[in-house]
């Protein structure tokens, strides 16, 4: 988390794993649909990309963006989860609550989302001031395809912490609901805060996908191309952005440029999403 410390609940226990990077890169440049399967679904969705994403969808009016409290200049320095639980419930009950949060984190890591949601709903009913509970519950709903519920919890996380750390996921929840004005507003917040290159990259991909969903492929391509150059030492977020950009080139009819970028991604990670299939399809 972008706050001081993380208590005994370590982020790696429940972070969305490398799969989320693949899911974001191969999904967020195309119209969204609810998801319940795992890697097999990722491969099949990617294989359908050309048929599903070639034509931009007809532009439509998006609901007006929510009125949000402006973010502070930097994320708030909040106490860790164990401190907040003990303040709310006392030492003994607070310790038990922390144990339940850790249990939910393990369930999330194991992709037992129903179990994680059940535990977290019990916790959030008792207290709504523990950021880790709101954050993890929002991620659980996101992975279950519960876009409205996920957005609700991640909006609460944003307001409580002043953090943009989950803005890409929150924006993706709104994109799934075709609330494009909210996607745009969150992208501006994330871009201006610029917390890290990986987070900004993920937010950029979601924002570009939302623009493309409205049939504005040229604008989406422009957003993905802005300040892009091939890095000498690519990291995972560079591969995600290159994949998304290549996908957008293909959708825009620029097959040679798409093939060039897909080939570059494959050269650095042959198992990234369905990139090998994408290269073959453009050969």
Map each language-model feature to its residues.
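TPR/TPR-like (Sel1-like) alpha-helical repeat modules
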Residues: 160-164, 192-193, 221-229, 250-273, ...
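Solenoid-like repeat scaffolds
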Residues: 86-93, 121-128, 155-162, 189-197, ...
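Generic helix N-cap/helix-start motif at coil->alpha-helix transitions
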Residues: 58-64, 92-100, 126-134, 161-169, ...
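Alpha-helical segment of the N-proximal tetratricopeptide repeat
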Residues: 87-136, 142
């Amino acid at each position: 988390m972008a706050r001081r410390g993380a208590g005994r609940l370590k982020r790696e226990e429940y972070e969305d794993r490398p799969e989320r990077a693949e899911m974001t890169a191969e999904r967020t440049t195309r119209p969204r649909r609810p998801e319940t399967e795992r890697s097999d679904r990722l491969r099949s969705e990617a294989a359908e990309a050309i048929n599903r994403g070639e034509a931009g969808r007809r532009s439509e009016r998006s609901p007006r963006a929510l009125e949000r409290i402006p973010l502070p200049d930097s994320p708030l320095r909040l106490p860790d989860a164990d401190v907040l639980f003990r303040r709310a419930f006392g030492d003994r009950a607070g310790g038990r609550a922390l144990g339940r949060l850790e249990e939910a984190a393990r369930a999330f890591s194991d992709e037992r989302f129903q179990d994680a949601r059940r535990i977290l709903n019990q916790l959030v009913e008792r207290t709504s001031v523990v950021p880790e509970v709101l954050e993890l519950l929002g991620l659980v709903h996101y992975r279950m395809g519960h876009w409205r519920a996920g957005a609700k919890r991640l909006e609460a996380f944003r307001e409580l912490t002043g953090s943009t750390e989950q803005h890409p996921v929150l924006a993706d929840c709104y994109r799934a609901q075709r609330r494009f004005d909210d996607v745009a507003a969150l992208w501006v917040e994330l871009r201006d805060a610029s917390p890290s290159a990986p987070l900004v990259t993920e937010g950029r991909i979601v924002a570009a996908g939302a623009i493309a969903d409205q049939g504005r492929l040229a604008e989406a391509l422009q957003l993905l191309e802005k300040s892009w150059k091939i890095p000498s030492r690519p990291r995972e977020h560079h591969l995600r952005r290159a994949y998304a950009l290549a996908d957008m080139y293909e959708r825009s009819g620029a097959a040679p440029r798409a093939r060039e970028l897909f080939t570059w991604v494959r050269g650095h990670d042959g198992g990234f999403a369905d990139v090998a299939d994408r290269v073959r399809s453009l050969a």
